[in-house]
Amino acid sequence: MFSFKLSLTLSLNSLAFCMASKKFFTLQEANSFIPQLLEWVPQIQKLATSLNKDFPDIKNAREKAKWSGGSEQGVSYLNAVLKYNNLMHKVEEMGCEVKGIREGLIDFPSIREGREVYLCWRMPEKEILFWHDLNTGFAGRKPI
């Protein structure tokens, strides 16, 4: 009984901390990030396409790496992965959530009428024009 109470208390405290540390955006705050996203998202999209298409030798390199083999594409691939991860980290560090990089779809947690929702942005929109409930996704977008 004691360990269950302690575990439950720790879990609830962790949940409360996560909720308290989660960033919520006003429409104005979220819109202030759009110019940066308009620059970064196309770069991320290009890198994602490149990682999926331009490195056919990587699968073989991964298999050979088990036996100390390698690939001429290895260094280029790792550089692309590092750039991709760096840009994704910058976007996520803002506090927004990447929902689909191929579509250029990013959500900003927000509070609307006392409940948590997402301000929904999609490339190449110049500002956030839509929002949706947490469980409806892009299909549930509503005009602001």
Predicted regions located by residue number:
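Cationic, low-complexity basic patches in intrinsically disordered or flexible, solvent-exposed regions
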Residues: 6
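Interaction interfaces in information-processing and related assembly proteins
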Residues: 65-68, 79, 83-89, 100, ...
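Glycine-rich, aromatic-bearing surface loops/beta-hairpins
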Residues: 89, 93-144
